[in-house]
Amino acid sequence: MIGYNIAKVHSYAWLNIPIFYYPIPKRPTLIAVSGRNQELTKSFAERFGYKRTYSDWRGLIRDPEVEVVDICTPPNVHSEPAIACCEAGKPMLCEKPLARDAEEAKEMLRAAEKAGVVNMTGFNYRFVPAVSYAKKLIDDGFVGRVLNFRGAYLNVEVGDWGYINPNFPLDWHFRAETAGHGAIGDLGSHIIDLSRYLVGEISSVAGATATFVKERPLVDKPTVKGKVEVEDAAVAAVKFANGALGTIEASWMAPGRKDFLRFEVTGNEGSIRFNLERINELEICSLKDPNDVRGFRDVWTTSKTHPMMEKFWVEQGAGFGWEHSFVNELNHFADCVMSNKPVTPVGASFYDGYRNCLIMDAIVESEKTDRWVTLEG
């Protein structure tokens, strides 16, 4: 494990795979974790049961007992460890966004393809049963020909009113060198991934971004302010290669929204919509229903017959939690590693991570040029 923040839920997932998916071919063993702050790294290792710690990720990758690497660092510490894993022949999962920009992501993709190692980008919402069921319904023709995708991820980050508070410190999220993008990388990348997963490839975008808080107190000098270098919010209109239209929105300045990831897919025969704040439900509408009862209805998606629930240990109808999406995600990754097979189409590969970065870069370019941007490929 490289990193110790979002790595908490990743570690929880690794530890719980044998519980939820028992019996399994091979039980994951938490060997080592690396982090810059040794006090926090050691505390993290003790909490989750890692055997040893490293202050440098290079030592962790060289460790002969480490067979698989999970990269859970800020975006500026994604490409080097990932490429080093490829050179060492070790499969890896890298948290989203895959990189700070598409150029960096492409280098990671090329290294993975050259090495032939199993690679995965951490888009965990693909592994929510309701989302997976939406994918199945769309593929089975429930909505007919897809016409529109509408997606938004809105929240107010943790803290004293979160990032909307101008006194929230200028941490790595607000610097282009470490984050690459702001809200669109942190939140919008999930919507971009779901749009591609559910509808198909995006061919062109027109975007707008805004930075509402221009300066913030420095982390180590609170009386001094520094410039915010990334966006607080972004919106984009998109065209899909199959002719569908879409909208994408991301903002970490949305009071009242805790973790509001929502998408709606409409077709010529029906519609599907999902809200992460109601994670177990999928709303569906079919034009085949009688007119007097036609409309959205809720489907509880945690029965054994629903995708991602076939081997889940919870009783039929019991609630599925956000953290469980990581259990499903990492179990899928582990299965692909042991079988030496690609993580796609269920999971997101480095190619998906690269395309995601390409779209984010295009949205920012569109804001700068005030033009539609056509995507390569």
Sequence positions of predicted segments:
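N-terminal Rossmann-like dinucleotide-binding module
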Residues: 1-48
